[in-house]
């Protein structure tokens, strides 16, 4: 079973749309222990500096990137389960994305889809997928095949 308390999300920018915030809050209630750290929009270099100050060396860093690796929900659940409860930090860039040097620091880069999403929706999708991965590993009824 996934231990969500080992996961953290660092996200650039605020959620401005109420319906997205409501969706995020719904899934966060189902994922107690998941930490979400919001960073103020700034230049990419300032955002990178702030992110580097937050992450520690023992964290497994995953950046969300349109060129990252794509998974099915079951594959993502398996990959997370096989991480052996490492401290995993997911980083979602703002409107301008993340710097290439920050992406290069990542242990792996994740693509949620070949489509491009606003960062607010990417945050909702990632949190939903973490919830889905948790239910897949628990054998719960949420994920349908």
Curated annotation (Swiss-Prot):
Q: Got a GO cellular component term for this one?
A: cytoplasm
Q: Mainly resides where?
A: cytoplasm
Stated family? Belongs to the RNA methyltransferase RlmH family.
Record localization: Cytoplasm
InterPro entries according to UniProt: Alpha/beta_knot_MTases, RlmH-like, tRNA_m1G_MTases_N
Question: Which branch of life, at top level?
Answer: Bacteria
The family database entries (HAMAP family) matched by this protein are listed as: 23SrRNA_methyltr_H (MF_00658)
Q: How does it assemble?
A: Homodimer.
Q: Does the keyword Methyltransferase apply?
A: yes
- What is the uppermost EC class here? transferase
Q: Give the keywords, sorted.
A: Cytoplasm, Methyltransferase, rRNA processing, S-adenosyl-L-methionine, Transferase
Instruction: Give yes or no: UniProt keyword S-adenosyl-L-methionine.
Output: yes
Which SUPFAM superfamilies does this UniProt record tie to the protein? alpha/beta knot
Record's function text: Specifically methylates the pseudouridine at position 1915 (m3Psi1915) in 23S rRNA.
EC annotation from Swiss-Prot or TrEMBL: 2.1.1.177
> What is the reaction catalyzed?
pseudouridine(1915) in 23S rRNA + S-adenosyl-L-methionine = N(3)-methylpseudouridine(1915) in 23S rRNA + S-adenosyl-L-homocysteine + H(+)
The molecular function terms of the Gene Ontology recorded here are: rRNA (pseudouridine-N3-)-methyltransferase activity
Name this protein carries in UniProt = Ribosomal RNA large subunit methyltransferase H
